[in-house]
Amino acid sequence: MGNSATRRKPPFDPVADFTPITGAVYFSYFLYVPANFPAKTMKEFMAYAKANPGKINFATASMQTRITAADVVKKNGLDVSFVQYKGESAASTDLLADRIQAMFSSTTQMPLVKEGKLRVLGTTLPARNPQFPDVPTLAESGIAGGEFGAGWLAFFGPAGMPRPALDRLNKALLGALENPEVQSRIKAAGLVYTPIRSPEAMAKFVREESDTYRKIAVELNLMQD
């Protein structure tokens, strides 16, 4: 969604070019820092960033995390240097080596937190991730911005899908997603089963998500050709 929202001439229209079938899962983003970083909380991170303008290299590995990070930085008046990576693997390597000092990412970095190699300070979205209840939200820590920052996965079909086929697929996919074994795997991966389960609700969500990301991308001057 972030990639199409930041393109002046996107290669596809996420609203018009597909038929939403159902949501699947969503995941919040977490702010990770090296294990030796001076801050241990979000408030300490903000205080350090404000006391050391220009010293934090902030990695982003997708347009979604770039928009989330830029929103937090702008709304809290921080001065950081953004470093764009093509993928999380390279960004994670540099974060471990302290070549960068902060990164928003999904739960994929949590094993490194458990090993004591990284530290997690906070998470986006209004509510805590149920799989990591000890990690406070940015809002709880009094940090502005980033509340929309989340990744999600859903099922889509081609535009103009016949309603009978759409209904059959929706029923079949929800049945598979609600299988106890699948639910167990979703939780084990740190994901959350989506509450967006009807084609209509998913279509509404996609429209709103596209509008939100495009509006913020324009405000943050992140639009690309």
Where do the protein language model's features map onto the residues?
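A ligand-binding cleft/hinge motif common to bilobed small-molecule-binding domains
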Residues: 1-9, 66-75, 102-135
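Hinge/capping helix and adjacent helix->loop/strand transition within the periplasmic-binding protein
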Residues: 5-90, 138-143, 152-185
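Conserved functional loop/turn residues at catalytic and ligand-binding sites
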Residues: 41, 99, 117, 142, ...
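Alpha-to-beta junction loops
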Residues: 52-56, 78, 96-103, 117-119, ...
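Structural recognition of the beta-strand scaffold that forms the well-ordered cores
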Residues: 57-60, 81-84, 102-105, 119-122, ...
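An extracytoplasmic/periplasmic, membrane-proximal ligand-sensing/linker region
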Residues: 76, 114, 163-225
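Hydrophobic hinge/microswitch elements
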Residues: 88-91, 96-98
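Short acidic active-site motifs
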Residues: 90-91, 108-109, 201
